[in-house]
Amino acid sequence: MTDAELLELYRRMVLLRVFDERALVYHRQGRIGTYAIAWNHEAIQAGATFALGEDDWIFPSYRESPIGLVRGMPPATILQWWRGHPSGWWNPLDWNVASICVPIATHVPHAAGLAWGTCVAIGTQIEATFQSSGFHQPEG
């Protein structure tokens, strides 16, 4: 990786962390409802989106809600989604980011369906899913 690419990757990680910290403050103030923090997930989210192309799709789970930021989604849209406000709904085609799924792994069939369809139609597109914490983690 070049120095410029490393800087961009770092910028994305900081963007995700700052958003996450602000969203947690809003949650504690009662401005948004439930919010699942994504601390320590920044490198995974930033690295994956950095490796994906613009035409590739992202299917985030609840801890990856800030991931749309690195695709250009306005922060207010994500915050409004957590409030359940209609202005928090987005067209997935605008950023190739599917709606956030809170129940763990419920977005996997959607990603698989899109992957199958694009494989048949295009053949070169990637659909990335994120499972957050808790999915297939050992207990104990």
Regions found by a protein language model. Name each.
Residues 18-140:
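Cofactor-binding active-site loop characterized by glycine-rich and histidine/acidic residues
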Residues 6:
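Active-site-adjacent structural elements in enzyme catalytic domains
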Residues 1-2:
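Charged, compositionally biased N-terminal leader segments and the immediate start
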